[in-house]
Amino acid sequence: MSSVPVIPQARGLRHTGPVTVAVVSGPTAVGKGTVVGALLRSHPEIVVSRSVTTRPPRPTERDGIDYDFITPEQFDKLVDGEGLLEWATVHNSHRYGTPRGPVERAVADNRTVVLEIDLQGARQVRETYPQATQIFLAPPSWEELVHRLIGRGTETPEQQKQRLETAKVELANADEFDAVVVNDTVDHAVAHLVELLSL
C-alpha cells in the first residue's frame, strides 16, 4: 500500500502587490469549483475564466456555465490557433484548457481574473504569464480528500484510483505555488482567498 501524502499547511503570499490574474489549483475533489463559485457569488466584480474540456459533463454540470464542453476537433483548432492560454491532458484521458481571449479582455478592463486549473496548467501559466499569483487549494487531510472524491460518485473505481495517484503528485508540488489555502470549510477558504486577492 502506498504511503499517505503530506498535506501542505496554509501560508500567505510570498510577494505583495495587486493581483490581476490568480491561478487556483489543487488536487481532484479538493473543492476548487465550489470554492471559486462561492468566491464569485460574494465578489461578482471578479471574472472567473471558464475552461474548455473534451470530457463529457458530470450530471450536475451545465455547458457554457461550468465548462464549455467541446469536441477533440474543436480543441485542436483552439490549440493550433493559439486560442488557449494553457492546456493539458488530465488524468491521462481528457483535455482541458483556458481560452486566452476572455482573460486578456478582463485584464485590459483592470478586473481580477481567476483561473481554476490543474498543476500542468498552472505551470504553463507560470511560463506564459509570470505575473499571475498562484494559489494552491489543499484538503485538510488525505482522508478527507479520498472521502470527497468517493462521495461525489462521478468516477468509476479505476478513475478514482487514477485521480488519487495524480493528487499525490499535485500535493507533492504545492511548494511551487505563491500561497496555500486549506479548504477545511468553504467559508474559511473563501475568506483566505479574499484576503490573498485583496478583494
Swiss-Prot record:
Predominant localisation class: cytoplasm
Catalytic activity: GMP + ATP = GDP + ADP
Pfam families, alphabetized: Guanylate_kin (PF00625)
Annotated Guanylate kinase-like domain residues: 19-198
Record-linked InterPro entries: GK/Ca_channel_bsu, Guanylate_kin-like_dom, Guanylate_kinase, Guanylate_kinase_CS, P-loop_NTPase
Alphabetized UniProt keyword annotations: ATP-binding, Cytoplasm, Kinase, Nucleotide-binding, Transferase
Binding site for ATP: G26, P27, T28, A29, V30, G31, K32, G33
GO cellular component terms listed in the entry, alphabetical order: cytosol
Sample GO molecular function, one term: guanylate kinase activity
Function (record text): Essential for recycling GMP and indirectly, cGMP.
NCBIfam families in UniProt: guanyl_kin (TIGR03263)
Name of the protein: Guanylate kinase
Gene: gmk
